[in-house]
């Protein structure tokens, strides 16, 4: 990829969004209206009395000793799981939180020490998933977010610029799953001439279980069927990294910290201010959280449970209990800073005990069980853990074509692998974009936009139905476009729509 800017890569604090004070996020939260009530749904009767699985059975399936140990531990915890009760939930203590706005005061940066500090860092990108949510069958990291530019290109470009500007060696490590490993290893061949050391490793594979019995889906001595297995979440990174030998290798090379993030989060760049704080305050585990907004529905919130920081995945909560958390505003970005020596010790002492989440996929009309661990749940395992409240700039995930449209528009500018808000846009917020199901896959999305509209002055866009956009279109303010069932709406080339509602008959109304 090519960047036109020649300025030094930015690792200092980015321009902050107006997110308000940290304290203001907790106003009027009533935590104790439903004392002593369980949050999680109960197990099916058969699963509650599931028989143990012999280690020999798992070994016969090809599982490694540390994999089967982790799987057995999770399965046992699932059957005998501890409930979370609302009367134990509290707002995180101020001593467990730090506001990004205050880092330069709490932990001032010594710029003369920047290179030495960066040389202690390893960047790890989580690359286990395919782009299924957008209709792609390849590794999500290989998706284009700009003409000829992929998520992986962005990560490499950013780290390469840091290495050049500071004369350091920050390596890029990619954690793949069995779904992405071979493809990614082929793709990274193109970066051989770049000033970035790239390493990959493959995370564990766990067997699916039947929901009603918790019996294994795959059978020993049969051909491996990928549909009967799954990657057990981002929390598997710690054990898989240890198994790969990379933790010991990096410790021997003088590395002290790892910065973990999702490959599709365009905001997860190296931040020297955060790294400096982690270093000076001797933090073992730092989790970046941000202000939760209306579109944040699938993910985790931060709370204090039994006087420890705790990440709660909303997908695991009974639907009728979700209202308890509607005012919880600390949202997990999955940007995580970890002390390498600390995580190595926890693994060796078998004290890394991550909570899990459960998914119930359907295969051949039968409900399965997948037990997964988010990496952010490690926050409760480390002695000196902290949550860092960061601006939304550091959380730019691309999980849908709606987010892809914003990323590809003139709202943002690409600079050395970083995404920066266009200086010509007033304010710091990005527009709220909701594209209908007709745009849900990348192929359909690309068919429906002859070119990406000008969104520089857009606040809100909703598109529903069979809608096609021409070229050189400008959208401003609030624009709502609805094609009624059986009708098609074509937005002509060169049109400027500002605060308009377009119906299926192409009537244009002021909003």
UniProtKB/Swiss-Prot annotation:
The active site is at 399. Substrate binds at residues 128-129, 262-264. UTP binds at residues 126-129, 140, 203, 233, 264, 399. Residues 460-511 are annotated as: Oligomerization. One of its GO terms (molecular function) is UTP:glucose-1-phosphate uridylyltransferase activity. Its EC number is 2.7.7.9. InterPro entries: Nucleotide-diphossugar_trans, UDPGP_fam, UDPGP_trans. Induction: By cAMP through transmembrane signal transduction. It is an enzyme of class 2 (transferase). It comes from Dictyostelium discoideum (Social amoeba). This is UTP--glucose-1-phosphate uridylyltransferase 1. GO terms for biological process: culmination involved in sorocarp development; galactose metabolic process; glycogen metabolic process; UDP-alpha-D-glucose metabolic process. It holds the Pfam family UDPGP. Belongs to the UDPGP type 1 family. Pathway: Carbohydrate metabolism; galactose metabolism.
């Amino acid at each position: 990829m090519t960047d036109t800017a020649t300025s030094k890569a930015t690792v200092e604090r980015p321009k902050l969004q107006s997110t308000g004070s940290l304290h203001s996020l907790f106003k009027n939260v009533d935590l104790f209206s439903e004392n002593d009530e369980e949050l999680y749904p109960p197990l099916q009767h058969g699963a509650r009395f599931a028989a143990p699985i012999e280690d020999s059975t798992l070994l016969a399936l090809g599982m490694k000793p540390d994999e089967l140990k982790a799987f057995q531990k999770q399965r046992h915890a699932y059957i005998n799981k501890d409930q979370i009760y609302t009367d134990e939930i509290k707002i995180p203590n101020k001593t467990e939180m730090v506001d990004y706005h205050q880092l330069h005061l709490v932990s001032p940066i010594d710029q003369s020490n920047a290179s030495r500090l960066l040389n202690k860092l390893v960047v790890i990108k989580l690359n286990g998933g395919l782009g299924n949510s957008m209709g792609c069958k390849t590794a999500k990291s290989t998706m284009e977010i700009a003409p000829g530019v992929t998520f992986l290109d962005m990560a490499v470009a950013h780290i390469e610029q840091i290495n050049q500007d500071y004369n350091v060696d920050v390596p890029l490590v990619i954690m793949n799953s069995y779904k992405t490993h071979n493809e990614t290893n082929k793709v990274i061949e193109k970066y051989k001439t770049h000033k970035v050391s790239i390493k990959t490793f493959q995370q564990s594979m766990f067997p699916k279980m039947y929901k009603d019995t918790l019996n294994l889906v795959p059978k020993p001595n049969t051909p491996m069927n990928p549909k009967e297995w799954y990657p057990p979440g981002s929390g598997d990174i710690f054990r898989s990294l240890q198994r790969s030998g990379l933790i010991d290798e990096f410790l021997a090379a003088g590395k002290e910290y790892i910065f973990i993030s999702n490959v599709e989060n365009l905001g997860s760049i190296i931040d020297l201010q955060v790294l400096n704080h982690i270093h000076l305050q001797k933090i073992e585990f730092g989790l970046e959280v941000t202000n939760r907004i209306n579109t944040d529905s699938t993910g985790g919130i931060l709370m204090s449970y039994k006087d420890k920081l705790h990440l709660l995945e909303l997908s695991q909560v009974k639907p009728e209990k979700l209202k308890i958390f509607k005012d919880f505003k600390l949202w997990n970005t999955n940007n995580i800073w970890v002390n390498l020596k600390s995580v190595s010790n926890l693994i060796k002492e078998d004290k890394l005990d991550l909570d899990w989440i459960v998914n119930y996929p359907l295969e051949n009309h039968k409900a399965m069980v997948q037990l997964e661990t988010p990496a952010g749940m490690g926050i409760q395992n480390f002695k000196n853990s902290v949550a860092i409240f960061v601006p939304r700039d550091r959380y730019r995930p691309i999980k849908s074509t709606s987010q892809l449209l914003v990323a590809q528009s003139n709202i943002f500018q690409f600079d050395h692998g970083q995404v920066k808000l266009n200086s010509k846009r007033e304010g710091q917020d990005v527009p709220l974009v909701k594209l209908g199901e007709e745009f849900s896959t990348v192929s359909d999305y690309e068919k429906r936009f002859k070119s990406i509209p000008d969104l520089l002055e857009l606040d809100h866009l909703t598109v529903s139905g069979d809608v096609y956009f021409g070229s050189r279109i400008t959208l401003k303010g609030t624009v709502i476009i609805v094609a009624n069932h059986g009708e098609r709406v074509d937005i002509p080339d060169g049109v400027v729509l500002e605060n308009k509602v377009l119906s299926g008959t192409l009537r244009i109304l002021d909003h």
